[in-house]
């Protein structure tokens, strides 16, 4: 178990590092965010199954629901920004403009 959890934590750290490095492009940020959610889902599932926490079996499913909602909202925002501006480069956008 420790080597698996270390690998999952490293995957989360790599996705977080990717989010920090490629924050100027929306598509890269969304992919890194999905990687972070996937590693959180995997780690929470392994912890719940190893500790046999019967009351928490629905937590990974709830995490997947939130990840799906986040992905849908992110893709809708990506399509809107791409249609309006022609690219997903975040630094060229002035989001405070009405």
UniProtKB/Swiss-Prot annotation:
Disulfide bonds: none
Gene Ontology annotations for the cellular component aspect, listed alphabetically: mitochondrial inner membrane; respiratory chain complex I
Reactions accelerated catalytically: a ubiquinone + NADH + 5 H(+)(in) = a ubiquinol + NAD(+) + 4 H(+)(out)
Localization of this protein: Mitochondrion inner membrane
Bilayer topology term: Multi-pass membrane protein
Predominant subcellular localization, coarse grouping: mitochondrion
A molecular-function term among this protein's GO annotations: NADH dehydrogenase (ubiquinone) activity
Entries under InterPro entries matching the protein: NADH_UbQ_OxRdtase_chain4L/K (IPR001133), NUOK/Mnh_C1-like (IPR039428)
Purpose of the protein: Core subunit of the mitochondrial membrane respiratory chain NADH dehydrogenase (Complex I) which catalyzes electron transfer from NADH through the respiratory chain, using ubiquinone as an electron acceptor. Part of the enzyme membrane arm which is embedded in the lipid bilayer and involved in proton translocation.
Protein name: NADH-ubiquinone oxidoreductase chain 4L
Lineage of source species: Eukaryota, Metazoa, Chordata, Craniata, Vertebrata
């Amino acid at each position: 178990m420790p080597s698996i959890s270390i690998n999952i934590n490293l995957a989360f750290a790599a996705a977080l590092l990717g989010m920090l490095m490629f924050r100027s492009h929306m598509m890269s940020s969304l992919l890194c965010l999905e990687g972070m959610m996937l590693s959180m889902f995997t780690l929470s599932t392994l912890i719940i199954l190893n500790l046999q926490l019967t009351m928490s079996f629905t937590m990974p499913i709830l995490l997947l629901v939130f990840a799906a909602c986040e992905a849908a909202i992110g893709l809708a925002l990506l399509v809107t920004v791409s249609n309006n501006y022609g690219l997903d480069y975040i630094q060229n956008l002035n989001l405070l403009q009405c």
